[in-house]
Amino acid sequence: MTDTTLRHRTARVERVTKESSIVVELDLDGTGRTDISTGVPFYDHMLTALGAHASFDLSVRAEGDIQIEAHHTVEDTAIVFGQALGKALGDKAGIRRFGDAFIPMDETLAHAAVDVSGRPYCVHTGEPEHLLHAVIPGSPVRGTGEPGAPYSTVLNRHVFESIALNARIALHVRVLYGRDQHHVTEAEFKAVARALRAAVEFDPRVSGVPSTKGTL
């Protein structure tokens, strides 16, 4: 049995490019406290939901070229979150490794499954076709009153792929049914959050890394 009494798995990752500047701080053993600022209000809402429902303490500070569009900032933030997740997991000793969750939101039902395998892969399926073209308007950014960038729901797949590839996890996200672009997207993020929560939590019956290979 792994002694996890005093262990907090944390990471801080910073990434700066010509398109964005991102800092993510993550505590996998938190209580769901979040402090998110990306300049894309709907994305802030989704990352807040992810942190809260995964019970991660999550801080995100992102500045990007949102005057062009939100794509770079959204994708780069997901990359850095994935890197922080992988770093915080460390050697993965004592974790459950697998997790999945169904999340209903009004007319929508979404499902996510995670394997903290060290083999990055993402499957994203089932979104209604109109989400390829849907845009959620940007509300005023909290604390500034300035208009935030709109969020195109075609970015959902980019987010989940970026998290999976950079955290080195297998992540499957599917929408069983749904219509409203807000509900579909939020159900997906919450399903991913709950699946991650289950996968990264400690299993008192597991000693060492949960793999017959001895490493993940």
From Swiss-Prot:
Enzyme class: lyase
Pathway: Amino-acid biosynthesis; L-histidine biosynthesis; L-histidine from 5-phospho-alpha-D-ribose 1-diphosphate: step 6/9
Any single Gene Ontology cellular-component annotation: cytoplasm
Catalysis: reaction(s): D-erythro-1-(imidazol-4-yl)glycerol 3-phosphate = 3-(imidazol-4-yl)-2-oxopropyl phosphate + H2O
Recorded GO MF terms: imidazoleglycerol-phosphate dehydratase activity
InterPro entries assigned: IGPD_sf, ImidazoleglycerolP_deHydtase, ImidazoleglycerP_deHydtase_CS, Ribosomal_Su5_D2-typ_SF
EC identifiers of the protein: 4.2.1.19
GO biological process, one term: L-histidine biosynthetic process
Any Pfam family hit: IGPD
Taxonomy, superkingdom: Bacteria
Keywords: Amino-acid biosynthesis, Cytoplasm, Histidine biosynthesis, Lyase
Main location per the UniProt record: cytoplasm
Cytoplasm is among the record's keywords: yes
Compartment(s): Cytoplasm
HAMAP family: HisB (MF_00076)
NCBIfam families: PRK00951.1-6 (NF002110), PRK00951.2-1 (NF002111)
Family: Belongs to the imidazoleglycerol-phosphate dehydratase family.
Name of this protein: Imidazoleglycerol-phosphate dehydratase
Organism the protein comes from: Nocardia farcinica (strain IFM 10152)
Name of the gene: hisB
